[in-house]
Amino acid sequence: MSAPNPKAFPLADSALTQQILDVVQQSQNLRQLKKGANEATKTLNRGISEFIIMAADTEPIEILLHLPLLCEDKNVPYVFVPSKAALGRACGVSRPVIAASVTSNDASSIKNQIYGIKDKIETLLI
């Protein structure tokens, strides 16, 4: 695999990527996940996104780069993971997924895990 695109910042390390993909999988099971750049944009505009995950190997990466700007406007943490194929598997679909949004639900059983990941992503952004 080639070096990740320098525009893909912040990029999660392998341990954090694994934790993020686990939470993505659990949120998919609880119907708290939106898949794709367009749906991620919609969750940001509606104010229901907890955090945004994007794939660093997206080609061309510019099709995603409106999301970090929108995230900063809305004060939502965002992170890049190395592989769109792995993100697609975690989202429970057979195709690659370039962006996903974990949505908020106060009654969720994985609320604490979501907040834990959110804190780790926020420390990457500093």
Curated annotation (Swiss-Prot):
One of its GO terms (biological process) is filamentous growth of a unicellular organism. GO terms for cellular component: box C/D methylation guide snoRNP complex; fungal biofilm matrix; nucleolus; precatalytic spliceosome; small-subunit processome; U4/U6 x U5 tri-snRNP complex. One of its GO terms (molecular function) is U3 snoRNA binding. Its main location: nucleus. Pfam families: Ribosomal_L7Ae. It is found in: Nucleus, Nucleolus. Keywords: mRNA processing, mRNA splicing, Nucleus, Ribonucleoprotein, Ribosome biogenesis, RNA-binding, rRNA processing, Spliceosome. It comes from the Eukaryota. InterPro entries: eL8/uL1-like (IPR050257), H/ACA_rnp_Nhp2-like (IPR002415), Ribosomal_eL30-like_sf (IPR029064), Ribosomal_eL8-like_CS (IPR004037), Ribosomal_eL8/eL30/eS12/Gad45 (IPR004038), Ribosomal_eL8/Nhp2 (IPR018492). Component of the U3 snoRNP particle. Binds to the C'/D and B/C motifs in U3 snoRNA. Component of the 25S U4/U6.U5 tri-snRNP particle, a subcomplex of the spliceosome. Binds to the 5' stem-loop of U4 snRNA. Common component of the spliceosome and rRNA processing machinery. In association with the spliceosomal U4/U6.U5 tri-snRNP particle, required for splicing of pre-mRNA. In association with box C/D snoRNPs, required for processing of pre-ribosomal RNA (rRNA) and site-specific 2'-O-methylation of substrate RNAs. Essential for the accumulation and stability of U4 snRNA, U6 snRNA, and box C/D snoRNAs. Belongs to the eukaryotic ribosomal protein eL8 family. This is 13 kDa ribonucleoprotein-associated protein. The gene is SNU13.
